[in-house]
Design a protein with these regions (language model features):
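NAD(P)H-binding glycine-rich loop region in Rossmannoid oxidoreductase-like domains
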Residues: 1-26, 54
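Conserved Rossmann-fold NAD(P)-dependent oxidoreductase catalytic core, especially the SDR/UDP-sugar
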Residues: 7, 33-61, 76
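Active-site segment of SDR-like NAD(P)-dependent oxidoreductases
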Residues: 11-15, 49-57, 81-84
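NAD(P)-dependent short-chain dehydrogenase/reductase
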Residues: 59-61, 65, 69-112, 116-120, ...
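Core catalytic loop region at the nicotinamide-binding pocket of NAD(P)H-dependent oxidoreductases
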Residues: 103-105, 126-137
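C-terminal "lid/loop" region of Rossmann-like NAD(P)-dependent oxidoreductases
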Residues: 106, 134-135, 143-173
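Amphipathic terminal alpha-helices
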Residues: 186-198
Length: 198
């Protein structure tokens, strides 16, 4: 008998959603709706996104917000901030910093980065707690992107970020803190230990 489903599948990425809005809606909303219906009597913990906070500026954000609206009452939605760590997409900022390959940086953006190990620990805490609803999952610390690259001596083009993305995605970890979870991995220490300086 199944008593818990953890649903982490789906399409991610703001930029791709601008080119493929229908794909994002079909996968993230309609596909997940089928899962919700099939497991209607089972507790479901599912991946949402920090982009689901208002205002919704792109198809990815709207698909995640819609997903939360149709989620069953016994479910738990997880609004991930910007996840980094082993096997992260090579086009994401932290992998680019690690290999000294940052072509440009958004001058008006700040980001809350969460290490995948901390994310897994957060999910484990949610499984054990039996809480329901929606929660952010992030480090709870916002990082100005200009300050981040300057700290590591990276010189790159500076551009104003797209209006289709949030300026900041700082997580409110209150629910997770209340059940005993706090992030353990420090972003700057992680980069320092894993960066290729050659």
């Amino acid at each position: 008998m199944i008593d818990l489903v953890i649903h982490l599948a789906g399409l991610s990425g703001v930029r791709d959603s601008l080119d493929k809005p229908t794909d994002y809606w079909k996968t993230n909303v309609i596909g997940t709706q089928r899962l919700f219906e099939y497991y209607r009597d089972v507790r479901i913990i599912y991946a949402s996104s920090s982009t689901a906070h208002e205002p919704w500026k792109n198809p990815y954000a709207m698909s995640k917000y819609a997903l939360e609206r149709i989620a069953p009452a016994n479910s738990m939605g997880m609004r991930f901030t910007t996840v980094y760590g082993p096997n992260a997409r090579e086009t994401m900022l932290i992998p680019r910093i690690l290999r000294n390959d940052v072509p440009y940086i958004n001058t008006n953006h700040s980001r809350d980065f969460i290490h995948v190990d901390d994310l897994v620990r957060a999910i484990d805490s949610l499984i054990k707690s039996n809480v329901k609803g929606i929660t952010d999952i992030g480090s709870g610390t916002t990082n100005n992107l200009i300050e981040l690259i300057e700290h590591f001596g990276i010189d790159c083009e500076r551009v104003v970020g797209e209006h289709t993305e949030r300026l900041d995605n700082l997580a409110d970890n209150t629910l997770l803190n209340n059940i005993g979870w706090t992030p353990q991995v420090n972003l700057y220490e992680y980069i320092k230990e894993n960066r290729n300086d050659n």
